[in-house]
Amino acid sequence: KQKAPVVRLVDRLGYDPQSGCYLFGKIAYDQKGQRIAANDKGFFLGLGLRCSSSELIEYNLDNPDSIDLKSIIQLLRKIYGNRAVFAMSYFIATLLKQEFVKKHSAFPFLSMAGPKGSGKTTLVDFLNNVFFQLWQGIAAKDASTDKAVGRRFYHRHSLVIPFNEANGSLPKNLPENALLDAFHGGSLYDRAAKSQDAEVIGLPFDAGMAFVQNLEPFTMPAVKERVVTLRFLNAEEGGVTDETRTAMRELEGLATSTRATIGHKLMEMLSALKRDIFAEMSGLQDDLREHGVLSPRVAYTHSVIAGKLGWMGCPIRRCPITLATGLNG
């Protein structure tokens, strides 16, 4: 009698260390960027696993040849300037979080701050859709328990979790000093184990986090060094013009299948992106120090998201310097 195959159940989206693949419900990508489809029952027989997730995923793709990545980047820059380039770069770098933590024992947070009407949410929704996810992230609210919020963070590995509307202060279930440990790949939340000894259990924080808010909530200098901040402008501040409105309508008109196709092409490029990102980081940190960035941690955090900007039409040496000195144009 033939034995039934042993299938492992994975309850997280994103990177799966055991298989080395990225899982998005009923699709997966291997290290070479090859797309793998589950069978009609959701099993990846070649990988010996099943990805169990209640999250909504965009599975349909347009013709990949119909997507010109550079044109998409130009559209984003027309709306947001270099902010869009840095934001997309952070989402790409987060796919490699496990590599950053292994090599450097640290991975930064992203902050997207600016007044209502500056387009932050539109950009975040677009980037979530690029990586196949039909969600907007987690809302900052005190009503959620620590355990519930911790579990929501746990269910994504090497994907960005938008943390929305922490305007001026973080909720009680996400204390600011918890970010210090999470920066180094630790847990955001710990609890006592149900045992007689001193054992503590903590859900690992393997995702990236983008804080999306009107006012930044950070007060601790040590936390601020671990956050890359992008400042967005609304119409009153000159950030929204007739030209950007036209481009925004074009962006909003892109179907989720089109956005997912952009992600598909990026996943196909991931091995090359990985090689270039890590090859360029050291030189970028040297450039930042030469331009007055004295903190090694600040130089590192900014080099993470600036390691693959050339193909996005962003001068690779100028952009991180502009960002780290506070000019987000």
Where are these regions (language model features)?
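Extended alpha-helical interface modules used as scaffolds for assembling large macromolecular complexes
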Residues: K1-L9, L13-G20, A28-I36, F153, ...
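Conserved active-site and cofactor/substrate-binding residues in soluble primary-metabolism enzymes
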Residues: I67, F86-A87, Y300
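Generic alpha-helical secondary structure signal
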Residues: I67-Q74, N82, N173-N177, D242, ...
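N-terminal pre-P-loop "Q-motif" helix
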Residues: G81-F91
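Conserved NTP-binding/hydrolysis core of motor NTPases
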Residues: V85, T94-S271
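Short glycine/serine- and small hydrophobic-enriched flexible loop segments
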Residues: A93-Q98, G307-W311
